[in-house]
From Swiss-Prot:
Protein name as it appears in the record: Palmitoyltransferase ZDHHC4
Pfam family, one: DHHC
UniProt record similarity statement: Belongs to the DHHC palmitoyltransferase family.
Membrane topology term: Multi-pass membrane protein
Gene behind the chain: zdhhc4
Molecular function, one GO term: protein-cysteine S-palmitoyltransferase activity
Length: 345
């Protein structure tokens, strides 16, 4: 199996994973999610009904019911990446003169990430109960647009505080609900958003750090073996200089596991970097991803066919309602607002 075939399989697997996440993790409103939905509607008539039924039940189980599948997958991917890094890359880097301190950084990041991962999985996100409901009703004001006073959760039968939402996966209402993360098998809410943000940063740093070390190892290999000045004989028997594609293919055939790992890490890094930037934006404007998606579904009240008033497509009339200034917005993530306790005399 040649390089291009393996690379095509790799790209197909990655795109399939992205499609599944967009389709079944509540991101149908995003452009990518809408594209996946349109593709699904076109392809579904060609798939047998029994196979569609099996796929639907499987995806529903994975993405809409609490389970440990993604926890185990998360740990498996880490074991594979760190196993390959320790088994091959670490030794090559030492032989090529990399410092022991720089090679220890990925393991330090792994320890930090493991602590944050545990906190994300185990800490209560801010579950609303009958006993704490009255206090949580006073934390945030209702904007009467996205969150209206007096609305009751049809499942929990509790009055919904502003910025709260019922998670259909965990079957509970959560204060300042952001989203349900399948990778930590927990909701992200007022009390654990800080851990989730740091967890995202740590995973992004891990992927980036190992990718940089691996790239440096491969570059050193290219320089030391003289591949930049090498030549090869093509199918017509003509001598050709080794270009970038030839060098990449040679590295892939020489270090297949390392190159696959590097491709996976680069993909994870850029995916998480974009996700981190999105959540940092939400932190700065004091908004949750739930509010961001809900606000996109609300049009400006002045926009109707005969008004002559047209807002930009990115117009969001509710973005600033809970905005308290950048520093206070950041502080609200790391020191969540809590109900005021009345002192008893």
């Amino acid at each position: 199996m040649d390089f291009l075939t393996l690379f095509g399989i790799y790209v197909a697997v990655v795109l399939t994973c992205i499609a599944l996440v967009c389709k079944y993790s509540g991101h149908q409103q995003t452009p990518l999610g809408q594209l996946v939905g349109a593709f699904t509607r076109i392809v579904s008539p060609c798939i047998p009904q029994w196979l569609q039924s099996i796929c639907y039940r499987t995806m529903h189980r994975l993405f809409h019911q609490r389970n440990n599948f993604f926890l185990y997958l998360h740990l498996l991917l880490e074991v594979v990446v760190y196993g390959e890094f320790t088994y091959e890359v670490f030794g090559f880097c030492l032989d090529m003169g990399s410092s022991s301190l720089s090679l220890c950084v990925p393991y330090i990041l792994l320890a930090l990430k493991s602590c944050l991962f545990y906190l994300c999985c185990s800490r209560d996100p801010g579950t609303l109960t009958k006993s704490n409901l009255s206090a949580h009703l006073k934390i945030y004001q209702y904007d009467e647009k996205l969150f209206q006073q007096g609305m009751k959760c049809s499942t929990c039968q509790l009055i919904k505080p502003a910025r709260s939402k019922h998670c259909r996966v965990c079957n509970r209402c959560v204060q300042r609900f952001d989203h349900h993360c399948v990778w930590v098998n927990n909701c992200i809410g007022a009390q654990n958003t800080r851990y989730f943000m740091l967890y995202l940063l740590s995973v992004c740093a891990m992927a980036g750090n190992i990718a940089v070390l691996t790239t440096d190892m491969l570059l050193q290999t290219v320089l030391r073996t003289g591949l930049l000045h090498a030549h090869y004989i093509d199918e017509q028997g003509i001598q050709q200089p080794a270009g970038p594609l030839f060098i990449i293919q040679h590295l892939f055939l020489t270090f297949p596991r390392i190159v696959f790992m590097l491709g996976f890490l680069v993909f994870v890094f850029f995916l998480l970097a974009g996700y981190c930037l999105f959540h940092f934006y939400l932190v700065l404007v004091n908004q949750t991803s739930n509010e961001w998606f809900k606000a996109k579904g609300h049009n400006c009240q002045h926009c109707h066919p005969y008004s002559g008033h047209n807002c930009r497509t990115s117009y969001n009339p509710f973005r600033g309602f809970y905005h308290r200034g950048i520093l206070k917005n950041i502080g609200e993530i790391f020191w969540p607002l809590r109900p005021v306790q009345k002192k008893e005399n």
